[in-house]
From Swiss-Prot:
Pfam families membership: Aconitase (PF00330)
Protein name in the entry: 3-isopropylmalate dehydratase large subunit
Cofactor: [4Fe-4S] cluster
Any one GO MF annotation of this record: 4 iron, 4 sulfur cluster binding
Family, per entry: Belongs to the aconitase/IPM isomerase family. LeuC type 1 subfamily.
UniProt xrefs under PROSITE patterns: ACONITASE_1, ACONITASE_2
Pathways per UniProt: Amino-acid biosynthesis; L-leucine biosynthesis; L-leucine from 3-methyl-2-oxobutanoate: step 2/4
Source organism of this protein record: Campylobacter jejuni (strain RM1221)
Cofactor note: Binds 1 [4Fe-4S] cluster per subunit.
Length: 468
């Protein structure tokens, strides 16, 4: 029977399936961080349990760490407590920790792939909703709750219902100035934040095969904003080359054997999907969010919708509520809206390729005098590689702040926050009410668009800086 990529990986990991019971999956990799792990470790201690496979667990500090310094004292009191607790728990249970000052510390969904901890065909979980990022490698990766974190620690297994499958085929090639961030925002804008609910998505097609691993990770990262639990891309030579030589990756002849197996991790010809979408990506323009959920997105040269554009009353109310919060009007042109802060970073767009894209636009230019721009590498490894290329100098000379690794302004859990009423051009993944600080206003976009906004001080078209 022909199978999809998702079905192949799922079926290969079922260790038990009783009658009228959910299948139990073996979990190959477990990533943890300081926010969702303390309760899980406490549960183990109360039950006097040890971890089943501490060697298959990797911990990092990312959510509430300071990006101004690698010193613990630079963190808030709550952050200090969470970080110290993780340090104690990982030491007690024998889990490797990428702590403050570690050369590999960074955002959980960036350090996993960087170290080769994420591999094709594995099951990978983390107490974080954007775990779908790792599906870019052909891994079955998804976010879990704190009680499930404890269950994986104790048993290295998890009960999981089998999802429906959806194929999203991407035909054509991007226009200049358009990136996978624009693609995923466009997809969510066209179909809504619930279209993927109950599905494992597989991205495929001409465009996908030509994408770098960094670009693929951006795409899978925001599958959750589309409503899907899982986003996957079949591994190929680009995947294998990215993994080769990394710390946790197989070595030598063993690596070649794994590559032969990984080549089988693609949907069979004739495999049936429960749903499918085909996109012509050549029509996509740089996308900008205007509201308070990731489906409220338009092209840079478009106007904000009018209430008459929606027939559904709930959609009409959602539009009015969003526009009231973000202080914008129906039928308003998005280009030219003043911004106060630019944030380039996060597990969506904090990789070296993202920083290169931003630096290409900022090189030899200055940011607007009324703009504060934060450039936050997703890991200390990304930071080092960027500095080796001189990107830090480009950012600093442009007037940006060059920070240490962390989640930073993606969420209001650390000191990097916007004040009430401040408008942020952000490369992160969510534009919810107060996401980047109480009363803050978020406009989601690509690193190229964010860099252009930093220069002009308003939402603008990045393509003017690319000779388009």
């Amino acid at each position: 029977m022909a199978k999809t990529l998702y079905e192949k990986v799922f079926d290969a990991h079922v260790v038990y399936e009783g009658k009228n019971e959910l299948p139990i999956l073996y979990i190959d990799r477990h990533l943890i961080h300081e926010v969702t792990s303390p309760q899980a470790f406490s549960g183990l201690k109360m039950a006097k349990r040890r971890m089943a496979r501490a060697d298959l667990t990797l911990a990092t500090i990312d959510h509430d760490v300071s990006t101004k310094s690698v010193d613990l004292n630079a963190c808030s009191d709550m952050a200090k407590e969470q970080i110290t607790t993780l340090m104690q728990n990982t030491k007690e249970f024998g889990v490797r920790l990428l702590g403050l000052g570690d050369k590999n510390q960074g955002i959980v969904h960036i350090v996993g792939p960087e170290l080769g901890f994420t591999l094709p065909g594995v099951t990978l979980v983390c107490g974080d909703s954007h775990t779908a990022t790792h599906g870019a490698f052909g891994a079955l990766a998804f976010g879990i709750g704190t009680s499930e974190v404890e269950h994986v620690m104790a048993t290295q297994t998890l009960k999981q219902a089998k999802l429906k499958t959806m194929k999203i085929e991407c035909k054509g090639q991007f226009q200049k100035g358009v990136y996978t961030k624009d693609l995923i925002l466009y997809l969510i804008a066209q179909y809504g934040t619930a279209k993927g609910t109950g599905y494992a998505i597989e991205f495929c097609g001409e465009l996908i095969r030509n994408l770098s691993m960094e670009a693929r990770m951006t795409l899978c990262n925001m599958a959750i904003e589309f409503g899907a639990k899982v986003g996957m891309i079949a591994p190929d030579e680009i995947t294998f080359e990215y993994i080769k030589g990394k710390e946790f990756a197989p070595k030598g002849e063993e690596f070649q054997k794994y590559c032969e197996y990984w080549k089988s991790l693609r949907s069979d010809e004739g495999a049936k999907y429960d749903a499918s979408i085909t996109l012509d990506v050549s029509k996509i323009k740089p996308q900008i969010s205007y509201g308070t959920n990731p489906s409220q997105v338009i092209g840079i040269d478009e106007k904000i919708p009018k209430i008459s554009d929606f027939k559904n009353q709930s959609e009409q109310k959602s539009l009015l509520d969003a526009l009231y919060y973000v202080n914008l009007e129906q039928d308003q042109v998005i280009e030219g809206v003043k911004i106060d802060i630019v944030f380039i970073g996060s597990c969506t767009n904090g990789r070296l390729e993202d920083l290169k894209i931003a630096a290409d636009i900022l090189k030899g230019r200055k940011i607007h005098k009324n703009v504060k721009a934060l450039i936050v590498p997703g890991s200390m490894q990304v930071r080092k590689e960027a500095e080796n290329l001189g990107l830090d100098k480009i950012f600093i000379e442009a007037g940006c702040e060059w920070r240490y690794a962390g989640c930073s302004m993606c969420l209001g859990m650390n000191d990097d926050k916007a004040n009430s009423g401040q408008r942020v051009a952000s490369t992160s993944n969510r534009n919810f009410v107060g996401r980047q600080g109480k009363g803050s206003i978020t406009h989601l976009m690509s690193p190229a668009s964010a860099a252009a906004c930093a220069i002009e001080g308003v939402i603008c078209d990045n393509r003017k800086y690319l000779g388009v």
